[in-house]
Amino acid sequence: MSKDDIRGHILEVAGAIFAAEGFQNATVRKICAQADVNVAAINYYFGDKERLYIEAVKNARRLIERRWP
């Protein structure tokens, strides 16, 4: 998988978990387990949970705008 593919996969998984559980209840470890990556990958691509959340929301918005311009 390329770096872009890994980053995108993490965003998809994180978006689903944040949507289902909310920011407070979603954990980086849970996201890592479902995305099949380690915590270092989250830190490498996003820095921290808050930044991951922001990027996941931006990603969801992009997907919505593509679907319904």
Predicted regions and their residues:
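N-terminal intrinsically disordered/low-complexity leader segments
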Residues: 1-4, 16
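Amphipathic alpha-helical linker/stalk segments
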Residues: 56-69
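Helix-turn-helix
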Residues: 9, 17-51, 55
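Onset of an N-terminal alpha helix
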Residues: 3-11
